Design a protein with these regions (language model features):
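Compact beta-sheet-dominated domain cores in extracellular/mature segments
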Residues: 1-129
Length: 129
């Protein structure tokens, strides 16, 4: 018997405003995660402080919504951008942040180096975390 994982997109961001971002060891690397321990990602086609991930892209890669703050081990600059749909999205060193619907539990890093929705996705290493 073979089981297959099928990710179903959600229409609402899985992250909410006012959360603390943290550094977490995943696969021997210190990565940026949300307050629930889910790995955060950045999208190569985004430009500094501007997201191009909307529609079906945002369904698979929910933007980290609202304001965020830096928790222990987070050394970069946390900020926000205003998306073209009027919502606010958290950023790290100017990169808009996203979660990945394929990551269902803390410590997973399934979205790293995936070429999907028009570009390459990367996890966010945190120096010194």
């Amino acid at each position: 018997l073979t089981a297959a994982f099928v990710a179903t997109p959600k229409t609402q961001p899985v992250a909410s405003g006012g959360q603390m971002l943290q550094a977490r060891q995943i696969g021997g690397v210190s990565l940026l995660t949300n307050a629930k321990g889910l790995t955060l990602y950045w999208f190569a086609p985004d430009s500094p402080n501007k997201s191009v991930c909307y529609g079906s892209c945002a369904a698979y890669w929910p933007p980290v919504a609202g304001n965020a703050s830096a928790g222990p081990g987070v050394t970069g600059t946390i900020g926000t951008i205003k998306r073209t749909d009027g919502t606010t999205q958290a950023t790290y060193d100017g990169h808009p942040l996203y979660t990945y619907i394929g990551d269902s539990a803390p410590g997973q890093d399934g979205g790293n180096n995936i070429n999907l929705n028009g570009g390459l996705w990367h996890d966010v290493p945190v120096a010194g975390g």
